[in-house]
Amino acid sequence: MAERMTFPMYAIHRQQTQALWQAVQSLLDERGVMVAGDPPAADPGDLLAHWRQPTLLLSQTCGYPLVTQLPEVQTVGCFHYAAPGCEGRRYRSLLVVREADSHRMLGDFFGRRAVCNAEHSQSGYNVLRKMVAPLSREGRFFSAVMFSGSHRQSLRELQQENADIAAIDCVTYALLQRHQPQALAGQ
């Protein structure tokens, strides 16, 4: 039975995502593993539901939900990206602010607004929580924390001045720099 395969985490440049899908499909085919259909044309939406689909053979996931919410999922490998901030399988999050605030230190954002992609994101939420914890007062640091649904949307919220700071993973940032630099304008 042929099963599905998707790479939703960094699907910023459709042609590159399709090329990755086709290369992996070819490798699997050589080993007798059939993958159904063509590369998905759309974002799968709810990623946690997507990762739990019984017909899903191979996908990408953020490490935090992998270890906290997906016990039925098996790790088969880890991509090594060439983006600045990546070293082998390790990567970093970047704290991104508007250009007008680029001279500020993290402590200067006390009482300001943060935007995070999702509560189940290591790179967009938990890393920021860990960084501000020693700076918090009575368990609080930001005046508000909103969830945008994606790193790209978090950047839009910064551009629209709905938030003041966001943590963005370095792979997303590098791909946006290369393929959609307007998404980083003003930051």
Task: Label every model-predicted segment.
Residues 148-155, 159-164:
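Hydrophobic hinge/microswitch elements
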Residues 1-74, 78-81, 87-90, 103:
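N-terminal hydrophobic or amphipathic helices and topogenic motifs
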Residues 59-61, 117, 148, 169:
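Conserved residues at the C-terminal ends of beta-strands
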Residues 75-78, 141, 166, 185-187:
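Short hydrophobic/aromatic-enriched beta-strand-loop microsegments
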Residues 32-39, 138-142, 184-186:
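Short, surface-exposed acidic
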Residues 61-70, 159, 164-186:
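A ligand-binding cleft/hinge motif common to bilobed small-molecule-binding domains
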Residues 51-58, 112-114, 159-168:
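Alpha-to-beta junction loops
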Residues 7-23, 88-148, 154:
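Bilobed "Venus flytrap"/periplasmic-binding protein-like clamshell domains
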